[in-house]
Amino acid sequence: KTLWFTLLLIGLYTSFLNASEITRWVITSPDSICWRVNGVHNDHIEMSGLKVSTVLRYGVNEAGEWVIDRNMVLPTFRTIPNDTHGSLQHHFNGDWAHLCLVNGQPLVGEKVETVSLNGIMTVKSVYATRGISLTRTLFPSTSQPAFCEKYELENTTDHPQTVQLPSTTLSYYTDEAKGVEGSYTLTATLSSPVKDGTYLLKAGEKAWFQVIYAGYKKHDQELALDVNNELLARRRFLSQIQGNLVLETPSDVINTMFSFAKIRGSESIFDTKGGYMQSPGGEAYYAAVWANDQAEYINPFFPYLGYQAGNRSAMDSFGLFMRYMNDEYKPLPSSIIAEGIDCFGVAGDRGDVAMVGYGAARYALASGNCNEAEKLWPLIEWCLEYCHRQLNADGVVKS
């Protein structure tokens, strides 16, 4: 009895710990979660656009201040060796709010109040000793090799305050010998609508500055991005994804989880020389497609979502696999990498051909598009014939 009672207490204590972990984030809508800060915590999330993916490692320290590291991944900036993992990565570490001046004094004494996620990260903080509230908005560009941040300061006092916002550009240059296209340039550009960045804010008035993290190849023109236009484009993308194929169950957790999964699956499509390529990400897998992840799993999902960029990525990936069909019925590669110019396979077939054939057939049925089906039919037939040739004596496909 004592043993069972002890085990029961351990189980209840574990459940309590798990419950505490779960309730750090609160669902505020079917598409949004919020962390109301009440202690130290660190977390991470990846967000992507057609030309960029960024992993944010963020949190709140013991002083209540915001801490962040941004690992920007540029899938089309290929590095040497140009393999599965050959996407340029660069860390931009630290926050920029401390560069602001309020009445000539540094902006210090931050207390982060909330962190919200809905495809965009929003961080709200107060600086009680300075009479300032700050809202940070973080998100990827939908179309450019850039990640965007907006810092908006509000005067929360009943008297005017002078706010000075930073303006500068930091540049980093990669080793020419390690880039497929030579040296790449990475920049962090801070700017505000007013050239000198100085504002006299009355009670309740706001001022903002933007930070654009961008990548450039040789001879690329400098991007002139406006954070508000980029934010509008991101919101349009999210509205489309969140508004289609809405899951409604008795569980708010499952509904919200599905909403976030739709965003992640759709945003991680990269515009490459090999076409639109949906990739797993995770600081490892970009500008490449796999027989399982893409052909079998997510490609048949996109017609249900009604996302045209997703359908395009599906057709592009099937087209890449079609290039490897052969009269000898040798296996297809497991993955097609480096923007489609190379491939990776295991010794023999791990079921990749069956995956591709299944996914192509499911996609054709789901899309209901005769033109697409006609393009996919040779691939489907080839995969079926391959599998037929792999039947063993018991009628099971060998792989």
Map each language-model feature to its residues.
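The feature captures the catalytic groove of carbohydrate-active enzymes
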Residues: 200-227, 283-287, 333-355, 385-399
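Substrate-binding groove/exosite segments of carbohydrate-active enzymes
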Residues: 239-374
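Short amphipathic alpha-helical segments with coiled-coil-like heptad repeat character
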Residues: 1, 158-162, 269-270
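Terminal accessory carbohydrate-recognition/targeting modules of carbohydrate-active enzymes
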Residues: 17-256, 306-307
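Bacterial Sec-dependent N-terminal signal peptides
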Residues: 1-21
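A generic secondary-structure signal for well-formed alpha-helical elements
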Residues: 155-157, 213-219, 305-309, 321, ...
